[in-house]
């Protein structure tokens, strides 16, 4: 009996050792490709590092101070704020409408429609940007072709070359690309709403619009809050690719966004220190949104 107990005591450390060995590769990769680059970016943001990497000097907060005196950065920040104020709201609303229609209309082709609406999210964002660049092209683009066909030639323009419309073309492309993704999440939430609630509303004479506004949305407020924060974060990240592919930040910075301006400073102008300061600033915004998302998730779980 004593020998068996001694063997069990000796065997206890083995599972712990096995767990440590199993986790070690993930820890090493996280340190190499996440923690260390983040620390290095934070350090470089306090230096005047350039692409040559010579004579990097510690400049303290100079990059951050200059950031808010840089008109191009301010323009990129304002453009990003505009997208964050408009795109998530419209995207979530459109995805809710699509989800409600597909949830209520019991069609045989339901799977097909869900797939079609979700498909833009599967396509590479670079490909999406190229496709919509052709759609908005002033000469061969379908937008100007349609306007010409219906006699609205006065509205034809170079959509991506006009400072008044370039940013909103990117916003529309973001909406088209992301609506299907959030639609799937909202459909999953709507499937959890009892059909009896909708039936009672129908007997009371409620329209489909009233069911969406007064029944579905209040019951889904937690998941809507989460998807809204995800849409905010996605707008920051995805707008960079579309801005770079569709307009390159032009014309004259009219469609430049934070990450696109960071890319220009770091990889075009070679101002790595300043680019890293912009990166850290953008990262701080993303972390704040992630914390808000986690808070909403915890609140949702606590209410269930």
Describe the predicted segments one by one.
Residues 11-304:
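A structural signal for multi-pass alpha-helical bundles of membrane permease subunits
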């Amino acid at each position: 009996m004593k020998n068996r107990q001694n063997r069990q005591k000796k065997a206890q450390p083995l599972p712990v050792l096995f767990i440590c060995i199993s986790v070690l590769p993930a820890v090493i990769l996280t340190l190499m490709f996440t923690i260390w680059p983040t620390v290095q970016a934070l350090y470089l943001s306090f230096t005047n590092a350039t692409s040559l990497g010579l004579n990097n000097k510690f400049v303290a907060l100079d990059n951050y101070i200059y950031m808010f005196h840089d008109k191009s950065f301010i323009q990129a920040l304002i453009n990003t704020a505009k997208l964050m104020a408009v795109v998530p709201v419209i995207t979530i609303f459109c995805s809710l409408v699509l989800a409600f229609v597909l949830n209520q209309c019991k069609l045989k082709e339901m799977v097909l429609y869900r797939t079609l609406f979700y498909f833009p999210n599967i396509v590479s964002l670079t490909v999406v940007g190229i496709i919509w660049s052709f759609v908005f092209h002033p000469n061969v683009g379908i937008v100007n072709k349609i306007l010409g066909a219906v006699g609205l030639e006065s509205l034809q323009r170079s959509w991506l070359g006009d400072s008044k419309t370039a940013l909103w073309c990117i916003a529309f492309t973001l909406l088209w690309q992301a609506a299907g993704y959030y639609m799937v999440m909202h459909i999953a939430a709507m499937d959890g709403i009892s059909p009896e609630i909708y039936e009672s509303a129908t007997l009371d004479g409620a329209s489909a619009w009233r069911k969406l506004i007064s029944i579905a949305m209040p019951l889904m407020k937690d998941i809507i809050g989460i998807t809204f924060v995800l849409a905010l974060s996605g707008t920051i990240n995805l707008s960079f690719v579309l801005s770079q592919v569709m307009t390159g930040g032009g014309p004259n910075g009219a469609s430049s966004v934070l990450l696109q301006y960071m890319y220009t400073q770091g990889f075009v102008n070679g101002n790595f220190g300043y680019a890293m300061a912009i990166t850290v600033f953008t990262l701080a915004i993303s972390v704040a949104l992630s914390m808000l998302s986690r808070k909403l998730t915890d609140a949702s779980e606590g209410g269930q």
